[in-house]
Amino acid sequence: MNVNQNKKVLFLTDIENGLEPILQEATNTSAENMLTIQSYGASISHPYGEIMRSVIFAIYQEDVEEIFVVGTKDKKTSAGNGLTQLETMKDKIQTLDYLFQNCKPEFLGGTVDEWLNENSSDTIEKSVDMIRHHPLVPSYVKVRGLFVNHKGGKPSIAEVPDVKTGQAMPDHCLS
């Protein structure tokens, strides 16, 4: 993975310490050309949410031409699992589950537990696809997904395969 040394590269990463040096080496990006947005799970939940807004600003204000959405291999948000198990949350979660399943487009479908504990590979693939097909992201911007795997003591990087959905917005928004 060779990145043009003079171009800014945006990394949307999980909240994990120590990823930047690994990513600099893997992508051949210098520290001064590296921009980072961190969120739990490196997830973009909505095509017009705050994280996507930050990505778009970075593209236009910092001349970003390449974006990497980076997750930790097969990591699940354990905090989310703890939230759904709290007794004080059960009624709220039941109400939210109803909304998730019956009040689209405001909610994503599924359950609160699925939303909080989504698999990292699915999250990365969806986020890459959402950025790639967003109407405000120029077609020249390359968007790739990466996983950092810490097994065996030495981190390794794997590229996420392309997902070909072709749309960043739900079907009901396109009609």
From Swiss-Prot:
Gene3D superfamilies listed in its UniProt record: Carbonic anhydrase
Transmembrane segments: none
SUPFAM superfamilies xrefs: beta-carbonic anhydrase, cab
InterPro entries named among the record's database cross-references: Carbonic_anhydrase, Carbonic_anhydrase_sf
GO molecular function: carbonate dehydratase activity; zinc ion binding
Family: Belongs to the beta-class carbonic anhydrase family.
Name the record gives this protein: Putative carbonic anhydrase-like protein YbcF
